[in-house]
Amino acid sequence: MAAAGQAEECLPLPAAESSKTSLPTPPAVPAGKKPKKCLVYPHPPRSSRLSRSVLRWLQGLDLSFFPRNVTRDFSNGYLVAEIFCIYYPWDLRLSSFENGTSLKVKLDNWAQIEKFLAKKKFKLPKELIHGTIHCKAGVPEILIQEIYTLLTHQEIRSIQDDLANFTDYIYQMRLPLVPRNTVSKSIKNNIRLSELLSNPNVLSNELKIEFLILLQMLQRKLSRKLNPGWFDVKPTVGEITIDRLPAHSYKRRYKSRGSKEKAAQPLSKSDNDGNARKEIHVKQSGNPCENTENL
């Protein structure tokens, strides 16, 4: 029996079965290798504030690359030029634009775009172009929506809660009190190095700094007003009196008004002869006096 069992174990398996057991199953995705890129554009980041209609429009244009970071990818103007080349292929050539990150490349690309806009009599605010070049928060999204309306003649409802003021004031007000910027940090964050290189005018930069300082002071006042306990702000004398005004003070005021009205009424008197007299209070040169008339 033992020999028979050993013989059964030593029997060769069929060719089909041996091939199945000998060859390991290949993994679905080889380890260490990235899957092949699909033709579908990747999903936009959650921080993107573009509407769905604008995102679908960008996907339908079949651009050379999809803008995953709207603030960064539209700053050099290459994608903007590519969008205009799709709509006006005979007036603009994409080969004259360069997809780079240097300030010189950005200024050259946007200078060509501005010439094209002036030729076609299209109007794009220069503030939006300036904010897009220097990566101001929220500005590229507004610029893309303006281009979408300009080319498709369709108005969209903006999904941004607040207007862009080219600073991070709204973002700082949403933060807790501790991690908010100081004045020096606010100046560093809101004035880019590219702005100083493109516009080295000292006077304009000083005006920007003064505006940021005033904005920081306003933010500080609002923080103290909204969070008095954090800053240990004590109430003023007027606030204390309003909060602790006694209830009987209103009764005194009402009584004083009633007594004044009674004093204003004419009082009738009679003299020794029995003739009735009426006292009339007359105000002359600021001093009250009594005038009597015989009836």
Curated annotation (Swiss-Prot):
| Domain of life according to the entry | Eukaryota
Record keywords = Nucleus
User: Where mainly found?
Assistant: nucleus
Entry annotated with the keyword Nucleus: yes
Q: Where do Basic and acidic residues bias regions lie?
A: 270-282
Please tell me in which tissues this protein is expressed: Testis.
Q: Which Pfam families match?
A: CH_2 (PF06294)
A GO cellular component annotated for this chain's UniProt record is: nucleoplasm
The UniProt record lists the Calponin-homology (CH) domain at 48-154
Where does the UniProt annotation locate this protein?
Nucleus
What are the boundaries of the region Disordered?
A: 1-34, 251-295
This protein's record includes keyword Nucleus: yes
InterPro entries linked to this entry: CH_2 (IPR010441), CH_dom (IPR001715), CH_dom_sf (IPR036872), Spermatogenesis_Ciliary_MAP (IPR052111)
The signal peptide annotation in the UniProt record is: none
Spans of biased composition, class Polar residues? 284-295
Function in brief: May play a role in apoptosis regulation.
Q: Which PANTHER family match?
A: SPERMATOGENESIS-ASSOCIATED 4-RELATED, SPERMATOGENESIS-ASSOCIATED PROTEIN 4
Name of protein: Spermatogenesis-associated protein 4
Species this chain originates from = Mus musculus (Mouse)
Encoded by which gene? Spata4
